[in-house]
């Protein structure tokens, strides 16, 4: 869910909570998780692995299909940029009064918000020799051990991972245990894409301009090394990549 102003109302007090389709969001995550995008430590090129471009192309295509503006794929460096235009009108005089270089691209005087996530996944478990990823949903998790892979006898147990205890009754998305799921950060990618689609489908929700950026190679420390600052020119930016719901880190980045 997200919080946004209601269309037609003015002032920061006009807020509404919007609920996304959970099934659609889960399906989006599974679709992205199936694309192998493992980055590689010690490679000077960006992206460090060419497989990351497959997800970049998929996201570019989906952004165009949903109606996002200024969709740009940096094919060489594997960055994806897009814009969800703001719909809070402002007079030409107010726009012209802005001194920054973004004046002509602003649809309104609200701050431009940036949402970013990375497409690559960790190479902590090397899956390059068998890059097929098999995510699946577990509905209404019962709180017990989860058999991920019968053949390999791989189990996900609350005794080993106590955080599972908080997930009883919820829907889990897991793999077959032979690869990482890639929820870091394809969950963030899916959330941004779902939010973009929702806002484009609901023009009655008032919001400022939102810029989107998907990066390669965050897991090897090079996520923003080749970003285009003009394509991601924002007033405030949020990286959708973290732990529990409601967790927020600010003015700090140590990944």
Please report, for each region that a protein language model flagged, where it lies by residue.
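Short, Lys/Arg-enriched N-terminal segments with co-localized hydrophobic residues
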Residues: 1-14
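Aromatic-enriched hydrophobic runs in primary sequence
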Residues: 7-8, 27-32, 44, 48, ...
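Intrinsically disordered, low-complexity Ser/Thr/Pro-rich tracts
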Residues: 9-10, 95, 99-109, 196, ...
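Residue-level recognition of conserved structural "scaffold" positions that shape functional pockets
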Residues: 12, 89, 93, 124, ...
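A near-ubiquitous, low-amplitude feature marking generic local secondary-structure context
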Residues: 12-18, 42, 46, 65, ...
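Acidic/His- and Gly-rich active-site-bordering loop/insert found
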Residues: 17-171
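Acidic/histidine-rich catalytic neighborhood of metal-dependent amide-processing enzymes
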Residues: 164-255
């Amino acid at each position: 869910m997200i919080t946004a102003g209601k269309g037609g109302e003015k002032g920061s007090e006009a807020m509404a909570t919007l609920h996304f389709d959970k099934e659609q969001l889960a399906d989006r995550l599974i679709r992205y998780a199936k694309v192998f995008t493992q980055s590689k430590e010690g490679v000077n090129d960006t992206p460090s692995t060419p497989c990351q471009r497959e997800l970049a192309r998929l996201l570019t295509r989906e952004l165009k299909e949903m109606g996002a503006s200024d969709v740009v794929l940096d094919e060489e460096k594997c960055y994806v940029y897009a814009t969800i235009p703001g719909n809070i009108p402002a007079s030409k005089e107010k726009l012209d009064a802005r001194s920054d270089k973004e004046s002509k691209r602003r649809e309104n005087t609200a701050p431009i918000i940036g949402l970013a996530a990375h497409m690559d996944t960790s190479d902590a478990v090397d899956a390059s020799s068998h890059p097929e990823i098999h995510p699946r949903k577990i509905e209404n998790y019962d709180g017990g051990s989860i058999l991920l892979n019968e053949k390999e006898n791989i189990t996900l147990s609350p005794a080993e991972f106590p955080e599972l205890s908080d997930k009883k009754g919820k829907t889990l998305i897991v793999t077959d245990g032979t690869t990482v799921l890639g929820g870091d950060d394809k969950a963030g990618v899916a959330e941004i894409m779902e939010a973009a689609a929702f806002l484009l489908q609901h023009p009655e929700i008032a919001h400022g301009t939102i810029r989107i950026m998907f990066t390669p190679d965050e897991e090897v420390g090079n996520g923003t090394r080749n970003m285009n600052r003009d394509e991601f020119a924002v007033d405030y930016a949020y990286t959708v990549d973290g732990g529990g719901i409601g967790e927020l880190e600010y003015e700090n980045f140590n990944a």
